[in-house]
């Protein structure tokens, strides 16, 4: 079975990525990949180098983003000015300040234009940290594929009660996660997928992946396997 990784970080994911775009492409060729995606944290700055290296190697480049998201399911996501600990003004989502992760992929030229619009808006609208709002994501959703994201995503944190690892998933948490998944499905249709990451040494990932199997059966949302590398 051919595998195409749809979640990857180069050194352009500052502080969280390893290897240049050229090195990632070289490794993909070693593994006999025919295509691969790059999904940097909050930016698309690696895409030019990635595309150049991929095309030279006969590899299909897939352009993506791991976005920092505010209330992405709220189209009218209000923002407010806050004073941070240093006394500087910050513009943050009014409904909570925690940013969840979301994997976004461009499936065509229109999608790539919209991906860059989303990134640009995330820097223009929010102070210090680029943040994708519900309005930006939903108004630029044409040509995009949305994966539910890593264990820091809205769906995963709803399911697992935050960043910790519960001994088991309680029914109220599953019902809340089901509602989140259905709302994403309602917004993005067949372009929304549950993202499974096979990090079997991490209890959190195992709990998340098992629950996603159940969510997939209950909702009809397809699953996709990625390696968050």
Features from the language model and the residues they span:
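Phosphodiester-processing cores and adjacent nucleic acid-binding clamps
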Residues: 1-229
